[in-house]
């Protein structure tokens, strides 16, 4: 079904000079517009070299034209693509000429071509988002994973869960309808088993989706520890520039600093923080420590930096245990790696060891000695974790997929309703309306991933982040 009545046009290539410039037109008026511009309607799905005509019939440009009749096109509508020279002036001239050919043609909004593809059921909302994620990818792994999402890997896994949930809802509703007749549509134990399997699948999918979010947004690494432990030196060494001021004076860093790096195709967001201590009478230091706690609460991985002079100091252990306690209370199991810094002073051997279930890396941040070991450890650790958590959900040849926070929220809400349904089922030992209602709410939350039951303002916000011409 075609949801649009007007025709839209936009330059699809980036602004500026280039070898080729592309203009895309989509809508019902394309067959009417094409002869005015090209003297004919190009043969479907075949590249044709044609003159691009002005209003008086003179040739403005010679172009390659491609015509895709509805419904077999990206948007599901008639599409005409004009491939000409890549100068901005000539593209603007061609665009102005196109806008004069019909009264119902207008400039496309950002992401409108992709939105039309979604509205015309050519792609689902996850695939639409994957298109934007491919364009915006900041690492090789993110681009590859976004491509997997575009191919439908993520969508297929969710659709399977939705199908299972639909069948369970059908059994539940039927059992309720025939309860007065004492007709058992499906045994109670079978219902319980099916629900348990769905909950398990949703939880596995949540893990995989979480790592899909990390691949899209980047892994948040927070560097923390006591004042003057060498946190800023480590930050500078990891990001490759002297971004943070370093000094022997305790408490030099008062605010958080953020930088982005790539390690083996994975995006990392490195954050330097103010030092943590038991107490401080300095108001600025107090604000800095408050921000450090905020960063730690949102970290995907923590690097806890220790000054060699404080290794035997119990305050380091007390502060670290306090960090772990706070994170535990917030239901966060953030991995922590301990960094024994300043090996240039202690002459300790650079390397990796495991002590009391902590991974400990000895290095010299100031002299950038051993930081390559840390970088390799971080990238390998993240890759291993992603592969391990996704292994039960995806076959080896499928690979990872990209995901967004809203997908996580939908899975989390759906899981809560499923657990509520399970509680209802086990407590009453029967299939009732409350059980069926929880299943319906879980189904609705999962369906939001694909744009069903999704508010128009959210759809508008999603597509507004796209490029014009996409």
Curated annotation (Swiss-Prot):
Its cofactor is K(+). One of its GO terms (molecular function) is metal ion binding. Its main location: cytoplasm. GTP binds at residues 228-233, 247-253, 272-275. Pfam families: MMR_HSR1, MnmE_helical, TrmE_N. One of its GO terms (biological process) is tRNA methylation. SUPFAM superfamilies: P-loop containing nucleoside triphosphate hydrolases. Keywords: Cytoplasm, GTP-binding, Hydrolase, Magnesium, Metal-binding, Nucleotide-binding, Potassium, tRNA processing. Its EC number is 3.6.-.-. This is tRNA modification GTPase MnmE.
């Amino acid at each position: 079904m075609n949801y649009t009545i007007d025709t839209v046009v936009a330059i699809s290539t980036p602004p500026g000079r280039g070898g080729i410039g592309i203009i895309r037109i989509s809508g019902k008026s394309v067959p009417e517009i094409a002869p005015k511009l090209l003297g004919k309607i190009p043969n479907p799905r075949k590249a044709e070299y044609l003159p691009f005509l002005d209003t008086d019939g003179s040739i403005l440009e010679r172009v390659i034209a491609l015509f895709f009749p509805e419904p077999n096109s990206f948007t599901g509508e008639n599409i005409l693509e004009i491939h000409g020279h890549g100068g901005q002036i000539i593209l603007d001239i061609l665009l102005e000429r196109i806008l004069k050919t019909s009264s119902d043609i207008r400039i496309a909004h950002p992401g409108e071509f992709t939105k039309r593809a979604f509205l015309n059921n050519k792609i689902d909302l996850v695939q639409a988002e994957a298109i934007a994620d491919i364009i915006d990818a900041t690492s090789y792994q993110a681009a590859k994973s976004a491509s997997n999402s575009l191919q439908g890997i993520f969508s297929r896994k969710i659709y399977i869960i939705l199908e299972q949930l639909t069948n369970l809802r059908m059994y539940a509703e039927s059992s309720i309808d025939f309860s007065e007749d004492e007709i058992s549509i499906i045994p109670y134990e079978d219902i319980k088993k099916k629900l348990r399997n769905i909950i398990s699948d949703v939880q596995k999918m949540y893990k995989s989706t979480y790592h899909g979010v990390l691949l899209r947004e980047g892994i948040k690494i927070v560097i923390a520890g006591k004042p003057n432990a060498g946190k800023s030196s480590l930050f500078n060494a990891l990001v490759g520039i002297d971004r943070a001021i370093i000094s022997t004076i305790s408490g030099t860093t008062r605010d958080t600093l953020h930088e982005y790096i790539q390690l083996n195709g994975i995006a990392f967001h490195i954050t330097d923080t103010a030092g943590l201590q038991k107490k401080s009478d300095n108001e600025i230091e107090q604000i800095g420590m408050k921000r450090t706690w905020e960063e730690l609460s949102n970290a995907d991985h923590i690097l806890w930096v220790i000054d060699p002079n404080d290794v035997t100091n119990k305050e380091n252990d007390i502060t670290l245990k306090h960090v772990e306690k706070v994170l535990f209370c917030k239901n966060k199991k953030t991995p922590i790696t301990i960094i024994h810094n300043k090996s240039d002073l202690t002459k300790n051997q650079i390397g990796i060891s495991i002590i009391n279930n902590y991974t400990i890396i000895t290095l010299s941040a100031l002299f950038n000695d051993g930081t390559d070991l840390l970088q390799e450890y971080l990238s390998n650790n993240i890759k291993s974790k992603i592969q391990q958590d996704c292994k039960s959900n995806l076959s080896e040849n499928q690979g990872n997929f990209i995901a967004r926070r809203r997908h996580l929220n939908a899975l989390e809400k759906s899981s809560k309703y499923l657990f509520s349904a399970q509680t209802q089922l086990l407590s009453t030992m029967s299939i009732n309306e409350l059980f069926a209602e929880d299943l319906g709410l879980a189904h609705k939350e999962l369906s939001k991933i694909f744009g069903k039951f999704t508010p128009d303002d959210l759809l508008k916000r999603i597509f507004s982040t796209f490029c014009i011409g996409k």
